[in-house]
């Protein structure tokens, strides 16, 4: 071929001009990658996946970054999972403010009439029975700390506050938080995710961990529509959510709401402390039917560190006796999604319901 060719959406550009645009983009990419000398390959992998998954949604005139194109194609063009999308926004905030804003606003705007951001949302369908772990306020706060634009906080605050209150009103048993799935009539239209409505499967899906061995033997209460399990991971993330929202409320001058959130964080911090097992040296999930601790260990038990609930001695025990324990979580590849000694560790199986979810280990 004698002359270079180029494919473009701007027919006014010549092949040479397009080549210059590409060269400049490659130079910018190399400069960004050089900012992470300790993990350039990780940065490149992350940005490559995010770029591939970022699409235009013409129905809503927005740019979004779904969890994968493989999920989006059979879902009507796009599908947003709650915490996946917030995490995408967080990662995108490294060097693309606009995409970080777009994704955080998009998933927050999918909030249901009941007041929670759903597990998943796609054209014409939302999971109206369940949410997913409350990570939105933390991500929004972190993005704000980088770019300091208050309009962004104003855009999402009231929705995030409704969602925060929803957890306390709808997922509390005896002062603890647990995952659930509320039954509802979805009519004549059927979708594969509807098989989890109002049952244990749906409650597991609300955790975002789907087939985690933590939940293998948990009882689902058909009266409360929740797992009978005081969940360390959920309570820790909720405490972080309360604190993050309280910081946002302070920035926005919402003093009374700030106090409400600080008090709520304190309340659940006290309850989380009752899940400390001195014998094990770790915060453990508690079976709310028997009152006994569960010894199915997973990384979510370390979320209590993020919530800053353990004191120094407790934190040291958690790290020395469990994180750095090669029989549990330490090793060449960390962290496995279940302790290495757990019988389920060898399964290495993706979720039978959601084949694209990560393996157990």
What residues fall within each predicted segment?
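Well-ordered alpha-helical scaffold segments within catalytic/enzyme domains
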Residues: 32-35, 85-98, 135-149, 236-255, ...
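Extended glycan-interaction surfaces of carbohydrate-active proteins
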Residues: 36-75, 103-123, 176-229, 267-359
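Aromatic- and histidine-enriched alpha-helix N-cap/loop-to-helix transition segments
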Residues: 76-86, 95, 127-135, 155-159, ...
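Short, conserved secondary-structure transition motifs
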Residues: 125-131, 166-174
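Acidic/polar, glycine-enriched structural segments that form the non-catalytic walls/loops
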Residues: 1-78, 151, 161-164, 168, ...
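Aromatic/His-enriched, Gly/Pro-containing loop or helix-boundary segments
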Residues: 114-156
């Amino acid at each position: 071929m004698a002359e270079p060719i180029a494919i473009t959406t701007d027919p006014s550009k010549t092949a040479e001009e397009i080549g210059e645009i590409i060269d400049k983009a490659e130079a910018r990419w190399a400069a960004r990658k050089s900012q992470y000398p300790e993990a350039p390959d990780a940065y490149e992998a992350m940005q490559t996946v995010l770029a591939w998954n970022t699409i235009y949604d013409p129905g809503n005139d927005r740019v979004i970054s779904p969890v994968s194109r493989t999920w989006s194609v059979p879902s009507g063009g796009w599908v947003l999972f709650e915490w996946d999308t917030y995490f995408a926004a967080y990662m995108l905030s490294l060097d693309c403010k606009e995409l970080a804003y777009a994704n955080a606003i998009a998933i927050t705007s999918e909030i249901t009439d009941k007041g929670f951001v759903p597990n998943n949302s796609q054209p014409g369908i939302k999971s109206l029975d369940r949410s997913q772990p409350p990570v939105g306020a933390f991500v929004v706060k972190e993005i704000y700390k980088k770019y300091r634009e208050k309009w962004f906080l104003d855009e999402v605050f009231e929705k995030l506050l409704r969602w925060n209150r929803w957890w306390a009103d709808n997922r509390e048993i005896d002062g603890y938080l647990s995952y659930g799935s509320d039954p509802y009539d979805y009519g004549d239209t059927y979708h594969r995710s509807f098989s989890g409505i109002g049952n244990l499967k749906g409650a597991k899906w609300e955790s975002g961990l789907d087939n985690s061995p933590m939940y293998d033997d948990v009882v689902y209460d058909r009266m409360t529509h929740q797992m009978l399990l005081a969940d360390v991971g959920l309570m820790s993330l909720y405490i972080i959510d309360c604190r993050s929202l309280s910081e946002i409320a302070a920035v926005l001058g919402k003093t009374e709401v700030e106090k409400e959130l600080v008090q709520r964080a304190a309340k659940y911090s006290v309850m989380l402390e009752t899940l400390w097992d001195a014998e094990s040296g770790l915060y453990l999930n508690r079976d709310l039917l028997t009152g006994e601790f569960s010894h199915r260990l997973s990384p979510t038990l370390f979320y209590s560190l993020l919530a800053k609930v353990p004191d120094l001695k407790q934190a040291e025990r958690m790290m020395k006796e469990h994180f750095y324990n090669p029989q549990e979580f330490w090793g060449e590849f960390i962290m496995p999604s279940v302790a290495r000694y757990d019988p389920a560790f060898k399964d290495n199986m993706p979720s039978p319901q959601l084949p694209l979810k990560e393996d157990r280990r």
